[in-house]
């Protein structure tokens, strides 16, 4: 992709010269949809904490530990993965992240114990941490120089998924029980 710097009102803008606008929209849109699906899955976990608490007779400390494991793996791992993939781009990490999330969903749906819930939370977090840095990089690369538009479109996808996840949990998982979490695998497969 060839880029040039243009000044408009004293502000530098990078503009792609040779990437078709339709291709930019399709790629950024696809990454935003994948972000929606990823974050939808991530948002279901905290939404079902009350169900997990009841099913496993967990204390609030144990629910907090589930959240801690998920957040440590899902948040604190991201910068390290981003640092590595900035030096060694790995586009295949997008589907790898979704496969790891897929495994976490299956474990969560059929978890027989608190220890397995922790493993499921860790896998869901690792899947998210693996997905986000590469997906963000792809959105930027496909932006055609419109970095702000690409990033905001990517972010809207994730925020929409975060908004839909708890609603999906209330409508489909809570009425049918913990095993209904397995239905989320379709989102991991689509992502």
Question: What is the predicted function of each stretch?
Answer:
Residues 31, 115-121:
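Short hydrophobic/alpha-helical segments at membrane-entry points of transmembrane helices
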Residues 43, 71-79, 162-163:
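Residue-level signature of mid-helix packing/kink "hotspots" within the transmembrane helices
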Residues 100-105, 124, 188-191:
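MFS 12-TM fold signature
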Residues 120-157:
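Cytoplasmic helix-loop-helix junction between adjacent transmembrane helices
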